[in-house]
Amino acid sequence: MGFITKAIPLALAAASVINGAEILETRAGVQTLADKYIVVMNDGMSDKDFDSHRSWVNRTHRRRLIRRGAKAMGGMKYTYNFPTGLKGYSGHFDEQMIKEISKRADVKYIERDARVQINAIEQQDNVPSWGLARVGSREPGGTTYYYDSTAGEGTTAYIIDTGTDIQHEEFDGGRATWGENFADDMDMDCNGHGTHVSGTVGGRTFGVAKKSNIVAVKVLDCNGSGSNSGVIMGMQWATEDAQSKGADKAVVNMSLGGAFSQTSNDAAKAIAEGGVFLAVAAGNDNVDAAEASPASEPSICTVAASTEQDGKADFSNFGQVVDVYAPGDGITSAKPGGGSQVLSGTSMASPHVAGLAAYLIGLGKGGGPQLCDTIKQMAIDVIQNPGSSTTSKLINNGSGM
């Protein structure tokens, strides 16, 4: 079985307001995590005021724990303070504590934390891939990948996923490194999805940008499962690390998503506002991607999946929020422990775009979120039946072949 990444985060179905703070409700079927929440602060909050708020939360939570009958909860876990944009935190709180937090005038909204996971579709081992050849050619059916020898050299791709087998031969014994882990205590890809995605971005055989550096940011465990709060923490870590090394030389790939989540979209927007290019899978439910997050965030590059025959993959989401199509059906790339496997999904399409972004940065095309416009301008108008109100543009690296 191949893999499609699917997140089941929080939906903005409706909102209740208590003294100014929205408590966002969830749609039926969303797998929320019991008594776990994400709290987002008002825009423009200073670090000093944020520290003061969190101190109040910790004090209030401790007082509640020692009261008779107060339910034992873990309290605050992750703190979010993106270099630009989103400030907030996640944690384990009872209903009364959340009501107290919601009364604060400095709180913008609260969402329930939710489970994130990947779903399997199909897998066939050891067959040739077509995606690379399609990216480097203006005509379908080719078997050769044409590209400039710069191949993304000097760029860094952050893969927010299940981790990456950094020892895989695809990464030449050093181009892939471990970043951070917000999923479990095992710094390895015990699922396989993240290694496949990394190989499409920067593998020496399967990669679009064959000389780019890969950084593994693990937010999903061996079962392909994690939390929305952990994913956002991975997004923050990647943004901060990219900015410390040069945001204009960095790209981020997120082959995950799901139902609309304001927090997820706000975090994606913060990456873009931080000057970092972000490619995101459109989703695999054959619906309008405006219903998905972070795919529906307009400041990022949202990618739908195409077939070898230049059609829309039957599972791919569509709609006005889609920026481009990229190969996503039956894509060969690396698997943990060596060798390759074939997976399908918009999860496989998105890293073609992240790799193309790194490739173009290496060519001196400039970096940052505006690179998505360059990619759209270079794309070719070939996708058949792309879906209602959807672009028919397929990515191309401009090699002229």
Curated annotation (Swiss-Prot):
<dbReference type="Pfam" id="PF00082">
    <property type="entry name" value="Peptidase_S8"/>
</dbReference>
<feature type="glycosylation site" description="N-linked (GlcNAc...) asparagine">
    <location>
        <position position="58"/>
    </location>
</feature>
<comment type="similarity">
    <text>Belongs to the peptidase S8 family.</text>
</comment>
<feature type="active site" description="Charge relay system">
    <location>
        <position position="347"/>
    </location>
</feature>
<keyword id="KW-0325">Glycoprotein</keyword>
<keyword id="KW-0843">Virulence</keyword>
<keyword id="KW-0964">Secreted</keyword>
<feature type="glycosylation site" description="N-linked (GlcNAc...) asparagine">
    <location>
        <position position="223"/>
    </location>
</feature>
<keyword id="KW-0645">Protease</keyword>
<dbReference type="GO" id="GO:0004252">
    <property type="term" value="F:serine-type endopeptidase activity"/>
</dbReference>
<feature type="glycosylation site" description="N-linked (GlcNAc...) asparagine">
    <location>
        <position position="397"/>
    </location>
</feature>
<keyword id="KW-0865">Zymogen</keyword>
<dbReference type="GO" id="GO:0005576">
    <property type="term" value="C:extracellular region"/>
</dbReference>
<keyword id="KW-0720">Serine protease</keyword>
<dbReference type="InterPro" id="IPR034193">
    <property type="entry name" value="PCSK9_ProteinaseK-like"/>
</dbReference>
<dbReference type="InterPro" id="IPR037045">
    <property type="entry name" value="S8pro/Inhibitor_I9_sf"/>
</dbReference>
<protein>
    <recommendedName>
        <fullName>Subtilisin-like protease 7</fullName>
        <ecNumber>3.4.21.-</ecNumber>
    </recommendedName>
</protein>
<feature type="signal peptide">
    <location>
        <begin position="1"/>
        <end position="20"/>
    </location>
</feature>
<feature type="glycosylation site" description="N-linked (GlcNAc...) asparagine">
    <location>
        <position position="253"/>
    </location>
</feature>
<dbReference type="InterPro" id="IPR023828">
    <property type="entry name" value="Peptidase_S8_Ser-AS"/>
</dbReference>
<feature type="domain" description="Inhibitor I9">
    <location>
        <begin position="36"/>
        <end position="118"/>
    </location>
</feature>
<dbReference type="InterPro" id="IPR036852">
    <property type="entry name" value="Peptidase_S8/S53_dom_sf"/>
</dbReference>
<dbReference type="InterPro" id="IPR000209">
    <property type="entry name" value="Peptidase_S8/S53_dom"/>
</dbReference>
<feature type="active site" description="Charge relay system">
    <location>
        <position position="193"/>
    </location>
</feature>
<keyword id="KW-0732">Signal</keyword>
<dbReference type="InterPro" id="IPR010259">
    <property type="entry name" value="S8pro/Inhibitor_I9"/>
</dbReference>
<dbReference type="GO" id="GO:0006508">
    <property type="term" value="P:proteolysis"/>
</dbReference>
<feature type="propeptide">
    <location>
        <begin position="21"/>
        <end position="119"/>
    </location>
</feature>
<feature type="domain" description="Peptidase S8">
    <location>
        <begin position="129"/>
        <end position="401"/>
    </location>
</feature>
<dbReference type="InterPro" id="IPR050131">
    <property type="entry name" value="Peptidase_S8_subtilisin-like"/>
</dbReference>
<dbReference type="InterPro" id="IPR022398">
    <property type="entry name" value="Peptidase_S8_His-AS"/>
</dbReference>
<feature type="active site" description="Charge relay system">
    <location>
        <position position="161"/>
    </location>
</feature>
<dbReference type="InterPro" id="IPR015500">
    <property type="entry name" value="Peptidase_S8_subtilisin-rel"/>
</dbReference>
<comment type="function">
    <text>Secreted subtilisin-like serine protease with keratinolytic activity that contributes to pathogenicity.</text>
</comment>
<keyword id="KW-0378">Hydrolase</keyword>
<dbReference type="Pfam" id="PF05922">
    <property type="entry name" value="Inhibitor_I9"/>
</dbReference>
